[in-house]
Amino acid sequence: MPLYEGLGSGGEKTAVVIDLGEAFTKCGFAGETGPRCIIPSVIKRAGMSKPIKVVQYNINTEELYSYLKEFIHILYFRHLLVNPRDRRVVVIESVLCPSHFRETLTRVLFKYFEVPSVLLAPSHLMALLTLGINSAMVLDCGYRESLVLPIYEGIPILNCWGALPLGGKALHKELETQLLEQCTVDTGAAKGQSLPSVMGSVPEGVLEDIKVRTCFVSDLKRGLQIQAAKFNIDGNNERPTPPPNVDYPLDGEKILHVLGSIRDSVVEILFEQDNEEKSVATLILDSLLQCPIDTRKQLAENLVIIGGTSMLPGFLHRLLAEIRYLVEKPKYKKTLGTKNFRIHTPPAKANCVAWLGGAVFGALQDILGSRSISKEYYNQTGRIPDWCSLNNPPLEMMFDVGKAQPPLMKRAFSTEK
């Protein structure tokens, strides 16, 4: 429980804040400066060699229900050590989260754990609460994809979002391909063996560790040289001097020799433009072009970058350099209307910014009660509101039964002068 909650404390208990990511889950209490635990979003079952990913969108509902029930039980009774019936829940989610996943998650929380209420909070919007700003262009570089969403005066501009399958998963796939093609392994029996002869594939955890420990993002000039050598642009196949090689210990006596050329070239897939001229940098610029022209200047000067992939060394510097480089191209120069771009520095690590925003919002107990889906409402209707559905009930039906709107909400919706 939070440190300031004693046995004799009165009032409502602080909410539980859960950021359920595809790779890692952040969990803790509202009002605190960081999550209590950051754990892989997997469960382990007897008889299965590989752990099961909890966040899956392409499995049947009952199987997903079973995975989520087991995983959330671990969160409550192994890490948080609190009674789920006593505390509201704030769930940080992506705006592109499939409806069946949201519905299954809320069914687990309401029907199995019997929580008092649930708030489904968009991760991009929660990130702004940590900075105290109303408008920003928010880019979330996560495990599966990079998703950009402009927010103006606290309202997400949903028709201007953009996404690309460029994230940690794409980096791991590229890293594994290059390791299997180029790297050698020293074992107790022999040295210089090819990696495929020692292991057919590299485990996900090893790829994650190699990426975090050895890989980095080059500056713009060096990155363009690496891309030119890779694709033989203008007959140029000479790449810049690579960084030093790294010896990475595998299980037992095996030593993997990670080439320096791999350490900086892997991350270039985030900035290489594909056949449609799309990259992480163009994602932001294309989203800006879709926004109303009178909002572009404010959005461009308030870039917020979140997600674990953006924590790679040199990522933010390279992203800003790429944007300033691309904005001079004819595609954007005549139509964008602004050239000034600035990136905010949130008060938390990029992978925890959305969680911290949820912890800030969850600490506002009066507002949280009026914005959450109550257990009584869910038991009566058996459904949750969805932004992409036109068949949603009025807002007043979702308030806690028998609880009046807080003064702030009364003032916001009052017509009295």
UniProtKB/Swiss-Prot annotation:
What's the subunit arrangement here?
A: Subunit of dynactin, a multiprotein complex part of a tripartite complex with dynein and a adapter, such as BICDL1, BICD2 or HOOK3. The dynactin complex is built around ACTR1A/ACTB filament and consists of an actin-related filament composed of a shoulder domain, a pointed end and a barbed end. Its length is defined by its flexible shoulder domain. The soulder is composed of 2 DCTN1 subunits, 4 DCTN2 and 2 DCTN3. The 4 DCNT2 (via N-terminus) bind the ACTR1A filament and act as molecular rulers to determine the length. The pointed end is important for binding dynein-dynactin cargo adapters.
**An example Gene Ontology biological process:** microtubule-based movement
Say which species the protein is native to: Mus musculus
CDD domains, per this entry? ASKHA_NBD_Arp10
Tree of life domain? Eukaryota
Q: Which UniProt keywords apply?
A: Cytoplasm, Cytoskeleton
Mind telling me what this protein is named? Actin-related protein 10
Q: What is the lineage of its organism?
A: Eukaryota, Metazoa, Chordata, Craniata, Vertebrata
Q: Which family does it belong to?
A: Belongs to the actin family.
Q: Which Gene3D superfamilies match?
A: 3.30.420.40, Actin, Chain A, domain 4 (3.90.640.10)
Gene Ontology cellular component list: cytoplasm; dynactin complex
Q: What does this protein do?
A: Part of the dynactin complex that activates the molecular motor dynein for ultra-processive transport along microtubules.
Give the UniProt subcellular location, in the record's own words: Cytoplasm, Cytoskeleton
